[in-house]
């Protein structure tokens, strides 16, 4: 049997349903994330995702999306049902999903192992390491995508609700 909502409950429900309509969750690399050289992390991430010239594609975003899409859809659906039932707010659902999705993208970045780095890239990393520049946030010096950890640590989310 359907539950009838009266008074303040209906006003709250209308407000939350309106906020769902206007809500937005963005996950990825934002303008504030830049390398010390000033190069946007999003630019470097897109080169790694799709490849460019001599740099082979090392996709991490699309594999994460493909692997998690059904789970994300189920989680959004159950979250918005909880909003409709008055258990949580739209912003809470989107914040929770943003944290989860950004963590899964970071995991995807960390799991990339191929194509292997060129020997010249590994040599350049070793030179930087011996010159005192921070290198290797996770894994070995020869692991793709995680030399400094900047890209990995720049995955973030924004909620507009």
Segments from the language model and where they lie:
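Short, Lys/Arg-rich flexible segments
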Residues: 1-161
């Amino acid at each position: 049997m359907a539950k009838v909502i009266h008074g303040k409950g209906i006003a709250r429900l209308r407000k939350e349903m309106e906020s769902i309509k206007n809500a937005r969750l963005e996950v990825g690399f934002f303008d504030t994330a830049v390398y010390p050289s000033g190069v946007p992390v999003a630019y470097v991430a897109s080169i790694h995702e799709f490849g460019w010239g001599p740099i082979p594609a090392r996709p991490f975003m699309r594999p994460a999306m493909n692997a998690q899409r059904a789970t994300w859809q189920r989680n959004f659906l159950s979250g918005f049902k909880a909003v409709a039932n008055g258990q949580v707010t739209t912003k809470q659902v989107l914040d929770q999903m943003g944290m989860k999705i950004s963590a899964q993208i970071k995991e995807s970045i960390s799991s990339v192992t191929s194509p292997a780095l060129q020997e010249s890239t590994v040599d350049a990393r070793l030179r930087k390491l011996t010159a005192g520049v921070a290198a290797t946030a996770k894994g070995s010096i020869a692991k793709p995508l995680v030399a400094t950890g900047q890209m990995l640590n720049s995955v973030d989310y924004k909620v507009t609700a």
